[in-house]
Swiss-Prot record:
<dbReference type="Pfam" id="PF00108">
    <property type="entry name" value="Thiolase_N"/>
</dbReference>
<comment type="subunit">
    <text>Heterotetramer of two alpha chains (FadB) and two beta chains (FadA).</text>
</comment>
<protein>
    <recommendedName>
        <fullName>3-ketoacyl-CoA thiolase</fullName>
        <ecNumber>2.3.1.16</ecNumber>
    </recommendedName>
</protein>
<dbReference type="InterPro" id="IPR016039">
    <property type="entry name" value="Thiolase-like"/>
</dbReference>
<keyword id="KW-0012">Acyltransferase</keyword>
<dbReference type="GO" id="GO:0010124">
    <property type="term" value="P:phenylacetate catabolic process"/>
</dbReference>
<dbReference type="InterPro" id="IPR020617">
    <property type="entry name" value="Thiolase_C"/>
</dbReference>
<keyword id="KW-0808">Transferase</keyword>
<dbReference type="InterPro" id="IPR002155">
    <property type="entry name" value="Thiolase"/>
</dbReference>
<keyword id="KW-0963">Cytoplasm</keyword>
<dbReference type="GO" id="GO:0003988">
    <property type="term" value="F:acetyl-CoA C-acyltransferase activity"/>
</dbReference>
<dbReference type="InterPro" id="IPR020615">
    <property type="entry name" value="Thiolase_acyl_enz_int_AS"/>
</dbReference>
<comment type="pathway">
    <text>Lipid metabolism; fatty acid beta-oxidation.</text>
</comment>
<keyword id="KW-0443">Lipid metabolism</keyword>
<feature type="active site" description="Proton acceptor">
    <location>
        <position position="373"/>
    </location>
</feature>
<dbReference type="Pfam" id="PF02803">
    <property type="entry name" value="Thiolase_C"/>
</dbReference>
<dbReference type="InterPro" id="IPR050215">
    <property type="entry name" value="Thiolase-like_sf_Thiolase"/>
</dbReference>
Length: 387
């Protein structure tokens, strides 16, 4: 079986969804920009040699509809002979895109794939056109379709207080701002055209979603967003609404060596699981355990984790049940996470994997794990090994 390697990984800056940098930039353009950039950064690979493009996107309608992967590839002037498919596993879409490409390479059906994902939550809101089947409530709690309420449920089940959530959210912003200031994101962010507050076209090379002024005291003043009477989850402890894209160049190890391209990491194992939709945010726990089992590793073998921060109330129970509470500041989301950077749904799987690869190199660790919860009760995880 072929070894699957990541040759390169990049992303756009994360733009605010409400009147942000990409308010006049379409999702296809964000995607095409990264496709062009990945190929330009790796000229040893001819675009025509790509076997397929796998691109995650959740709200596949309006500008994100009609197979955005193919639309973006055509905009990027990728040769018409290269196919492209859009992948949807909700929040895990672009990580699923990576898994799909990896399996193709493992079986010998492909040698080089471009993977990634996008979501423009300013142009296509998460709730746009959603129409749940009325009979679904016979099998699943109606509130399971409301992500904020599932986070409230997890917080109550695991004893996660409002204070703990506020502290974690403040940490996310502080870490992300420190990473920005130190240049830790420089290797992953591709400068991307957008408009500033005055409407002037400029190149953005930083995440505009981060709020460096965030404090625990300020967060404590916010009202509960989903359960006004008894809730603890606020807008400040939820992932920010943002627009962005991320992309990775994935190849067989043998093809990378043939072309003289240096792999950054191997895909050591992959896992996806289902869980109770009412606690959809718990998915990373069984997904991570399964991925570690497939890799023949334990939690203690992983040097650094990227866990998508859908909500502080959601990620803290996962950290707790993976036995990592005492190691948060050594191993978990060291450059902040979605609370600070935002969670553009179809982009996030590739985004956290990209950030993880850079952290693994910076911290000089052998193994890293990226994992995320998925709406309606799923979890997805990938174990990476540095080459």
């Amino acid at each position: 079986m072929e070894q699957v390697v990541i040759v390169d990984a990049i992303r756009t800056p994360m733009g605010r969804s409400k009147g942000g940098a990409f308010r006049n930039v379409r999702a296809e353009d964000l995607s095409a920009h990264l496709m062009r950039s990945l190929l330009a950064r790796n000229p040893a690979l001819e675009a025509a040699a790509l076997d397929d493009i796998y691109w995650g996107c959740v709200q596949q309608t309006l500008e994100q509809g009609f197979n955005i992967a193919r639309n973006a590839a055509l905009l990027a002037e990728v040769p018409h002979s290269v196919p492209a498919v859009t992948v949807n596993r909700l929040c895990g879409s672009s990580m699923q895109a990576l898994h799909d490409a990896a399996r193709m390479i493992m079986t010998g059906d492909a040698q080089a794939c471009l993977v990634g994902g996008v979501e423009h939550m300013g142009h296509v809101p998460m709730s746009h056109g959603v129409d749940f089947h009325p009979g679904l409530s016979r099998n699943v709690a109606k509130a399971a379709g409301m992500m904020g309420l599932t986070a409230e449920m997890l917080a109550r089940m695991h004893g996660i207080s409002r204070e703990m959530q506020d502290a974690f959210a403040a940490r996310s912003h502080a870490r992300a701002w420190a990473a920005t200031q130190s240049g830790a994101f420089k290797n992953e962010i591709i400068p991307t055209g957008g408009h500033d507050a005055d409407g002037v076209l400029k190149q953005f090379n930083y995440d505009e979603v981060i709020r460096p002024e965030t404090t625990v005291e300020a967060l404590a003043t916010l009202r509960p967003a989903f359960d006004p009477v008894n809730g603890t989850v606020t807008a400040g402890t939820s992932s920010a609404l943002s627009d962005g894209a991320a992309a990775m160049l994935v190849m067989s190890e043998s093809r990378a060596h043939e072309l003289g391209l240096k792999p950054r990491a191997r895909v050591r194992s992959m896992a996806v699981v289902g869980c109770d939709p009412s606690i959809m945010g718990y998915g990373p726990v069984p997904a991570s355990k399964l991925a570690l089992k497939k890799a023949g590793l334990s939690v203690s073998d992983i040097g650094v984790f990227e866990m998508n921060e859908a909500f502080a109330a959601q990620i803290l129970p996962c950290i707790k049940d993976l036995g990592l509470i005492e190691q948060i500041d050594e191993k978990i989301n060291l450059n902040g996470g979605a609370i600070a950077l935002g969670h553009p749904l179809g982009c996030s799987g590739a985004r956290i994997s990209t950030t993880l690869l850079n952290l693994m190199e910076h911290k000089d660790v052998q193994f890293g794990l990226a994992t995320m919860c998925i709406g309606l009760g799923q979890g997805i995880a990938t174990v990476f090994e540095r080459v």
